[in-house]
Amino acid sequence: MGDGGLPKILSIKGDDKKAAYLRNLYRTVYLSDIYERYEIENKAEFEELVRILASSVGSPVNPTNLANTFKSVKKLNNITDKTIEAYIGYLENAYMIEKADRYDIKGRKYIGTTPKYYFKDLGLRNAILSFRQTEENHLMENVVYNEMRYRGFLVDVGNVNIRVKTEEGKWQRVTLEVDFVCNLGSRRYYLQSAYRLPDEEKMQQEKRSLQQIGDSFKKIVIVGERMKLRRDDNGIVQMGIYEFLTYSELIDA
C-alpha cells in the first residue's frame, strides 16, 4: 500500500529512490500537465486541495465546505465551490482520482451529495503527502475500491436509511453507510472494509448496515489480516484482505 502499483516502481530498488521517483512523477508529469492544459493560476491553492483530498481518502467531499475553509483559514475569496469542483474534475481527467457516487440502497436511486474520491495509485497519493500519513484503514479502503474497479465493477458508496427508537420513545431516522456497492451486469456485492476488528462490538458495528439491506446479494466484510472465509448466521461473509486480493473467486464462495 506504500509504493503503489505503477509499472516502473517495481524495478526501482530502495525506498528512498522509489519515493523520489513518485514525487518527481507527481510534479513533472501530473502537475505540469494539469497546469499547462487548464492554465491554472492559483497553483499553491490547487496543490493544497490535492493534499486535502489525499489526506481524506474514504471521507465525504463537499466542495462548499472546502471553499469555506479556503475562505476562513487561507483568507482566499477567489476559491469558490465551483473552483473546487473544477479542480477536482481536472484531477479526475488526469486519472489521479476517481469518484464514488452515493447510492440510496433501499430507495434505489443516486444521491447527488457528498461523494467520495479514491486515488488511482496509492504510491502517488503517499508521495503527495510526503509519505507522512499512512493510515492503514483508509489505505486498505482505497485498495478494495481499486481492486473492484480493476475487476470491472461499477463501485458506489451505499446509504441505508432506517428508523430507530430513541430513549425518549420517539422514532428517529438514521443513515448507515455501506463502504461499497459493487455492480457488474446482474452481479452485486456489498462490501465493508474494516482494517481491524478487535472485538465483537466493532464487528457488529461493521455488520449493522449490511444487516439492514433487504435483498439476497452477497454481503462481505473484509479485514486487514489473513483469514479463512467465514459466514455468520445471517449469511454475511468475513474474509481477509490477502485472500480477497489473491483469490478473486472467493467473493462468490
Q: Which stretches of residues belong to each language-model region?
A:
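Short, locally clustered residues in the helix-turn-helix/winged-helix DNA-binding domain
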Residues: 51-55, 71, 149
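Short coil/turn segments at secondary-structure boundaries
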Residues: 13, 41, 63-66, 100-102
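DNA-recognition alpha helix
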Residues: 64-75
